[in-house]
């Protein structure tokens, strides 16, 4: 997993409640187990019409949000069935951060495992960020994990917290496999002792 300390990027506002994993990546695209290649299918049914043409009114199809790497969502973001493909699609599309008032627990954990920083903040903060991004497409924020701050050049400043384990994983660029490999010698010693 790529380490995360400070990230500055364009904000895409998608503040809808209960965005579920089937909306994030529809089931017809879940035929592979590789982590890459899912970005083109992110929010597919919202981004494209039945003929496969981009819907111009969808935020991610608008030029001001091209290259966005910070997604702002609504309450209960990532609800529905557990599918790791959802954060894989978010990450593969180019998002490093998702900010929402609440996340579905399993989705939140899948984001950590996939290298997408999921930040919980108040609805008031989400609305303030979204309003700025809607008013000024291309609006950028800086997310500083070490300091626990979200800031904008316009003076916006929001403090946030993530649990210590998640913080460590992101700062050090460790996924579950990386964490396990840090204990490879102890695991080998245990296996020898119990063989």
UniProtKB/Swiss-Prot annotation:
Single Gene Ontology BP annotation: L-leucine biosynthetic process
Keyword tags: Amino-acid biosynthesis, Branched-chain amino acid biosynthesis, Leucine biosynthesis, Lyase
Reaction it catalyzes: (2R,3S)-3-isopropylmalate = (2S)-2-isopropylmalate
Signal peptide location: none
Enzyme nomenclature, EC number: 4.2.1.33
Pfam families noted in UniProt: Aconitase_C (PF00694)
GO cellular component: 3-isopropylmalate dehydratase complex
Pathway: Amino-acid biosynthesis; L-leucine biosynthesis; L-leucine from 3-methyl-2-oxobutanoate: step 2/4
CDD domains, per the entry: IPMI_Swivel (cd01577)
Annotated GO MF terms: 3-isopropylmalate dehydratase activity
Functional note: Catalyzes the isomerization between 2-isopropylmalate and 3-isopropylmalate, via the formation of 2-isopropylmaleate.
Oligomeric and partner information: Heterodimer of LeuC and LeuD.
Sequence similarity: Belongs to the LeuD family. LeuD type 1 subfamily.
Protein name in the entry: 3-isopropylmalate dehydratase small subunit
Gene giving rise to this polypeptide: leuD
